Amino acid sequence: MFHLVDFQVTIAEILIIIMKTFRVAIWNLDILISSIVRQLFKPLTKKKYSELDDEEPMELDYP
């Protein structure tokens, strides 16, 4: 018979072994994920005012 509790414990043990192998603690995961997200979204939030100055306004034709 399949025991769900034994399966969950096995998954938890595997995750702990993986985390020990890569020397990652649970409290370091928050710092790691936030730094990765910050690095990924940095180019999107950087304002490039010099490029905005080079743009020409669009001409609108009114009927």
UniProtKB/Swiss-Prot annotation:
Transmembrane segments: none annotated. It comes from Bat coronavirus 279/2005 (BtCoV). Could be a determinant of virus virulence. Seems to stimulate cellular DNA synthesis in vitro. InterPro entries: NS6_bCoV (IPR022736). This is ORF6 protein. The keyword Membrane applies. It is found in: Host endoplasmic reticulum membrane; Host Golgi apparatus membrane. Belongs to the coronaviruses accessory protein 6 family. GO terms for cellular component: host cell endoplasmic reticulum membrane; host cell Golgi membrane; membrane. The keyword Membrane applies. Coiled coil: none annotated. Pfam families: bCoV_NS6. The lineage of its organism: Viruses, Riboviria, Orthornavirae, Pisuviricota, Pisoniviricetes. Bat coronavirus 279/2005 is highly similar to SARS-CoV (SARS-like). Keywords: Host endoplasmic reticulum, Host Golgi apparatus, Host membrane, Membrane, Virulence.
